[in-house]
Regions:
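Blade/loop signatures of beta-propeller domains
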Residues: 61-110, 255-262, 459-460, 466
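Extracellular/periplasmic ectodomains of large secreted or surface enzymes and adhesion receptors
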Residues: 63-69, 73, 383, 387-412, ...
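Short coil/turn segments that connect the beta-strands within blades of beta-propeller domains
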Residues: 79-80, 130-131, 176-177, 221-223, ...
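Extracytoplasmic beta-rich repeat domains
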Residues: 114-125, 155-176, 201-216, 233, ...
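Short loop/turn segments that connect beta-strands within beta-propeller blades
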Residues: 146-149, 192-195, 244-246, 323-326, ...
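Beta-propeller blade signature
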Residues: 237-248, 311-325, 468-474, 565-575
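Flexible coil segments in periplasmic/lumen-exposed cytochrome c-class electron-transfer proteins
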Residues: 597-610, 614, 621, 625-626, ...
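Gly/Gly-Pro-rich "capping" loops immediately C-terminal to redox-active cysteine motifs
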Residues: 617, 621, 633-668
Length: 727
């Protein structure tokens, strides 16, 4: 059933200064035509009220207990539950459960699956507590499931008021009777854990034109801690703490030092004002001394060194912050990359562990970057213990030029956010990574900062065919113990078990179990959907489960990936019980049922012609790569925003005039109207060419800079040209 929300929504709108709900069509990512309607109120204000729109299944709504602060601190001693993003504050995905071992892992089967209506790039790590599972979805929705059966208990859909770059969400926090989620449009929302009803909803980011949230919500004692993304849009990295009780802002720490602060001298002129250093991925906390470890990312503009050459502190660094007091205090930092012009984030979430070095136990922290460097440091002072290269490296020290320069790995390669895990039984750290090269080009060496637009100095390169590798590193020596090649990028992290297994995945949708000591493969499962989310483990009534969320490849889409079967929660166990399959509404369906959303509507073929020239197509391709590709994909297949070609686009049944209205009225999403009329026309010419609409008038008529009735006669079917845009 659907929870009644009319009066609640009206009350909320009144509180934020609006007398009544807007008289507009339903706004949704999949309803491209709806986006062209004139929106009469602030979508951001409306988004603040969406938390009350709860869809519940039968049996939901009873009061629930949630982990206490002490439960979270003791997470490493509780293997029945999984209460933090990476199980513990240390960030090491390790379980002491022993039911699944090398002798029976080959018998793992799908215990249950649940469809996710909010299809997209799923990066969430589910939270499991006392038989219930809580997870976020690609566009910041929240679901509560029965962890034994996958039955939907309640879900709260969410449509961000805007998506700056990436519509992904890495997970919820659970404490104080609440489920917490940080959203792409900079909101921090607390929901009732038993019902999904909104409790409070506050503004999080200090700058909304160039920042967003994709990090999981971390709960530490009485604080909710979360960092902003937006390093590709010229923000200043920000990590903040909020009260779990009412959302009150408790403290902020910025990664880019301002005038008078230590490190400011590493930024020439005013380059610090849009220096980036976003903290988008995740954190680890040494709960013994209240030290938070965070990795500010690349400096901005991403691809251009001119005007900011130097160390650019504290970008591309591991920073240790003392958070015991009312304001964070930096204890030490270690910078992995200087003079970065390839978006070489230290993307891996830090992992804290006690390892043996020269046969002596030491408190260590491990990190990794997109350049393929894996680094182990002393946790107390930041001293480097070992640095190991896990991927092919070439050209990373050569700045991009206008003609282009090869670099390996590219911005989608190396070690990504989920990182790896430490096995205490073997003193091995196991980390997956991606081998992928690209040509990096700049279009200008003096990029202008425009709020809401990318701040790159060029276009992030198109993704190439890519493969993965799992590397096991000896903590004592830094040497490689074993490697396993993967057919697709390895970005789902690692789960290590007390029985000597290392579970991992690839973006092609394969799950693997390897021997942690030797790399021998024991199990492989083809899921049918891309995996960029990590694996979690838990136990109910003596039955051990492994769970992972699968979906679209999104920003990790490479040309060699297979098609996907939509978004699902997949949970595995031993035994031969029939698989329980749940659809997105909570109904039990046949196992491996096709995605019900896949057949919605019927794609059509493009028809008619449209005015545009090849000069406009070339100009539009350059603008699209710079301003649109991060959301809609370099091949127009969609990432965090809808596809602009192919069957799903064909189902929208748009004509060229409607497409023009949508693009001109709503793009870029946080800086509408900032392109010039001829630039909008060029982008539209590129889209029409890509979708096989032939040029009118022998290609000599330019796409108009104003609306034209003739555009209504051209229907767009999303029929992607086999050879790309028309020549």
């Amino acid at each position: 059933m659907t929870h009644a929300v009319g009066s609640d929504l009206a009350k909320c709108l009144q509180q934020i200064g609006l007398k009544q709900p807007p008289d507009t069509p339903k706004i949704g990512r999949d309803s491209v035509q709806a986006q062209s309607s004139k929106i009469r109120i602030s979508l951001l204000a409306l988004a603040a009220c969406f938390g009350g729109m709860v869809q519940t299944a039968v049996g939901a709504g009873e009061p629930l207990d949630t982990p206490s602060a002490d439960d979270l601190l003791r997470a490493g001693q509780d293997d029945n539950n999984w209460v933090l993003f990476a199980k513990t504050y240390a960030g090491n995905r390790y379980t002491a459960l022993r039911q699944i071992d090398k002798t029976n892992v080959g018998s793992l089967h799908l215990a249950w699956s649940t469809r996710i209506a909010d299809n997209g790039q799923q990066e969430t790590s589910p939270i499991i507590w006392n038989g219930r599972m809580y997870l976020s979805t690609a566009h910041d929705g929240v679901m509560a499931l029965d962890a034994a059966t996958g039955k939907l208990l309640w879900q709260v859909p969410y449509n961000p008021a805007y998506v700056l770059l990436y519509a992904v969400n890495r997970g919820v926090g659970l404490a104080d009777g609440k489920v917490f989620v940080a959203t792409a449009d900079c909101r921090i929302i607390a929901l009732d854990a038993g019902t999904g009803k909104s409790i409070w909803n506050v503004q999080g980011c200090l700058e909304t034109s160039n920042s967003f949230y994709s990090m999981a919500a971390y709960i530490y004692k009485d604080q909710l801690i979360v960092g902003t993304g937006g390093g590709d849009s010229g923000n200043i990295g920000l990590i903040s703490a909020f009260s779990v009780n009412d959302g009150e802002r408790l403290w902020d720490w910025r990664s880019i030092p301002g005038p008078g602060e230590p490190g400011h001298e590493t930024w020439p002129g005013d380059s610090w004002k849009h220096g980036a250093g976003a903290m988008w991925n995740g954190i680890a906390i040494d709960q013994g001394n209240d030290t938070l470890f965070v990795t500010p990312g690349n400096p901005g503009p991403d691809l251009v060194l001119k005007g900011r050459k130097g160390r650019n502190l504290y970008t591309n660094s591991l920073v240790a912050l003392d958070i015991f007091g009312k304001k964070p205090r930096m204890k030490w930092y270690y910078q992995l990359v200087q003079d970065d012009s390839h978006d070489t984030d230290p993307a891996m979430i830090p992992v804290l562990f006690e390892g043996l070095v020269n046969k002596q136990k030491r408190s260590l922290v491990a990190i990794g970057d997109k350049g393929g460097d894996f680094v182990i440091l002393d946790r107390g002072n930041g001293e480097v213990v070992h640095r190991t290269v896990v991927d092919k490296q070439e050209g990373l020290g050569v700045p991009p030029t206008k003609k282009g320069e090869l670099a390996c790995p590219n911005h989608g390669g190396g070690i990504q956010w989920n990182g790896g895990a430490y096995d205490p039984a073997t003193n091995i750290f196991i980390v997956p990574s991606t081998n992928e090269c690209a040509i990096f080009k700049i279009t200008t060496d003096r990029p202008a900062y425009i709020p809401g637009q990318l701040y790159l100095g060029g276009a992030l390169p198109k993704r190439q065919d890519a493969t993965g590798v799992v590397t096991a590193i000896d903590v004592d020596s830094g040497a490689v113990r074993w490697r396993q090649l993967l057919p697709y990028p390895g970005q789902g992290g690692v789960l290590v078990t007390a029985t000597g297994l290392a579970f991992t995945s690839d973006v092609g949708g394969n799950l693997y179990a390897f021997d942690a000591a030797t790399g021998q493969q024991y199990w492989k499962e083809v899921t049918g959907s891309s995996i960029v989310a990590p694996i979690a483990a838990y136990s109910i009534n003596g039955n051990e489960y492994l769970t992972v969320v699968v979906g679209e490849a999104g920003g990790q889409q490479t040309p060699n990936l297979p098609p996907t079967d939509g978004s699902r929660v997949l949970t595995y166990s031993l035994g031969s019980a029939p698989t329980i399959a749940n659809d997105a509404t909570g109904q039990v369906v046949l196992a491996n049922a096709p995605n019900p959303a896949a057949g919605a509507g019927a794609p059509i073929k493009s028809s008619g012609s449209a005015p545009y020239t090849q000069e406009q197509v070339a100009q539009g391709a350059e603008i699209y790569a710079r301003q649109c590709a991060n959301c809609h994909g370099s091949n127009l297949q969609g990432v965090s925003a809808p596809a602009l070609t192919g069957p799903s686009f064909g189902r929208s049944h748009l004509d060229a005039g409607q497409l023009r209205s949508i693009v001109v009225d709503t793009m870029p999403p946080t800086a509408r109207g900032t392109l010039k009329p001829d630039e909008y026309a060029a982008v539209l010419a590129y889209l029409l060419s890509y979708d096989c609409v032939p040029p009118a008038g022998n290609g000599k008529q330019r796409f108009p800079t104003t609306d034209a009735p003739s555009l209504k006669r051209t229907t767009l079917g999303g029929t992607t040209c086999a050879v790309g845009p028309s020549k």
